[in-house]
Regions:
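Post-HExxH zinc-binding segment in Zn-dependent metallohydrolases
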Residues: 108-109, 245-274, 281-284, 288, ...
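Single conserved hydrophobic/aromatic residue that forms the stacking wall/gate
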Residues: 1-11
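Switch/coupling subdomain of P-loop NTPase systems
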Residues: 42-56
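Short alpha-helical catalytic segment bearing the HExxH-like zincin motif
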Residues: 213-224
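Short beta-alpha connecting loops at secondary-structure transitions
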Residues: 206-210, 237-247, 276-285, 303-304
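Active-site-proximal, well-structured secondary-structure segments within enzyme catalytic domains
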Residues: 20-34, 41-42, 63-208, 279, ...
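Catalytic Zn2+-binding segment of zinc metalloproteases
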Residues: 226-240, 260
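C-terminal, non-catalytic "cap/extension" segments appended to globular domains
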Residues: 221, 229, 256-259, 267, ...
Length: 430
């Protein structure tokens, strides 16, 4: 645990100096959205240079963690840490080969679509070459979306939009507000992040976040709202263990709410063009994250079934896997070294090994629920609600089946979901 925490210590202390001011890495990253390309390039250089200072230390830290984890797995009677962790994480409903199917399906069915996003970006920004500091700026050249002003508007508009999906969903947030269970606005000295915290004794959860009136905050609120609804729906289950669901199920609740609420985002945006921008941004993001999830997961499999690897072999394996899931649309000339150590920025590899693919599995499930909703809203919401009520009293595939979807990572099924999102994006582009 102490070694795992060393990653956070190194990364959290990695401030850099910009315009004579010391700023954190997360704050520095916000400048990558600047419409000034020279500023973006400068901040990217500063971030890369600062990360490079930690590369050797983080490499050595991982060597220690890998050796320790391998020893733990041998002592427990396993041949490698991957197999040990599959059992430790309670992955009884899917296997290593299912994860490999997920990797392959993302590579073949999702990657071509995300490549199209990057090619559109290059064209809209009118660039000869897309560089690594060009991937975050809004391609419309318009100011950042502002869906609300202050926590009061965020709460009211979230309640209205979620209630339009199902009145009970909005009522859950209303009860939390009345009980003082919402702490939403960013304040000086407030801890970072956002989460829904279940309170099993009373059955009414608590939402914490750091809202700054952004589109991302809207998504965070309905995401955590999905977790909150899940908490309400499982409050009467007999055992606490039934209420604590695995991430493959918990994130299905929250990621689905992001998409189910999207038709009601006109509660946040009265301007039709802004509403379209917000929806397009959401759909592109949910697909674009999937190749990165597959990259990180496949890399972790390699790390632990090859426990004697050297630092150089690790870097080579990372580059090979990264290339498998790359759109090859960004020109990294002069910054190849930053790609070689990019895995070091992923907290999960250091602190919660093998925990990451669950987000990808749940995202595919959420897309399937949304597809059902677009065909038959009433029945889709009913099935979603019934699935959440189960808590963890059924297996993951049974919960997905109750929701009217499949726990499936085959190329054919993933292609169906990808084509559906693509068709919805095309409607927004009309």
């Amino acid at each position: 645990t102490r070694l795992q925490g060393d990653w956070s210590s190194d990364v959290c202390s990695s401030d850099l100096v910009y315009k004579n001011e010391e700023i954190t890495m997360p704050r520095a990253a916000t400048f990558l959205k600047s419409t000034d390309r020279n500023e973006r390039e400068l901040i990217y250089q500063l971030i890369v240079n600062r990360r490079e200072k930690d590369t050797v230390a983080l490499d050595e830290l991982f060597d220690l963690l890998r050796d320790l984890r391998h020893s733990v797995s041998l002592n427990a009677g396993y041949t490698n840490y991957r197999d040990y962790m599959f059992d430790a994480l309670g992955r009884f409903d899917y296997s290593v080969s299912d994860c490999e199917d997920f990797h392959e399906s993302i590579r073949t069915e999702i990657l071509p679509i995300t490549k199209g996003f990057m090619e559109e970006r290059k064209e809209r920004l009118q660039l000869d070459r897309l560089r690594p500091w060009d991937t975050e700026v809004d391609i419309s050249g318009k100011p950042a979306l502002k869906p609300f002003h202050g926590a009061r508007e965020l709460v009211d508009r979230s309640i209205r939009s979620m209630a339009r999906v199902q009145p009970y969903f909005g009522e859950c947030i209303r009860i939390m507000e009345q009980m003082g269970h919402l702490d939403l606005e960013s304040k000086d000295g407030k801890a970072p992040g956002g989460y829904n915290y279940p309170l099993y004794e009373i059955g009414v959860p608590f939402i914490f976040m750091n809202a700054v009136d952004s589109q991302r905050d809207l998504v965070t609120m309905v995401h955590e709202g999905g977790h909150a609804v899940h908490s309400f729906l499982t409050r009467d289950l007999e055992l606490t263990a039934f209420k604590g669901t695995p991430s493959e199920v918990a994130e299905l609740a929250s990621m689905s709410m992001e998409l189910l609420s999207m038709d009601a985002w006109d509660e946040f945006y009265t301007n039709a063009e802004e509403l379209k921008r917000a929806r397009k941004d959401q759909l592109e993001k949910i697909l674009s994250i999937l190749p990165w999830i597959a990259t990180v997961d496949k890399f972790q499999h390699w790390l632990y079934v090859n426990p004697k690897h050297s630092s150089a072999e690790r870097a080579a394996a990372w580059m090979q896997i990264q290339d498998e899931f790359s759109t090859h649309t960004v020109d990294y000339s002069g910054y190849e070294h930053s790609r070689k150590s990019a895995w070091q920025k992923q907290l999960h590899i250091y602190e919660v090994p093998f925990y990451y693919i669950e987000y990808g599995m749940a995202q595919l499930g959420a897309i399937a629920i949304w597809r059902n909703y677009k065909k038959d809203p009433a029945n889709a919401v009913k099935a979603y609600t019934e699935a959440l009520k189960l808590g963890y009293t059924k297996s993951i595939p049974e919960i997905y089946e109750t929701a009217g979807i499949r726990f499936n990572f085959s190329r054919g099924y993933v292609k169906e979901l990808a084509d559906f999102v693509k068709s919805e994006l095309e409607k927004l582009n009309d």
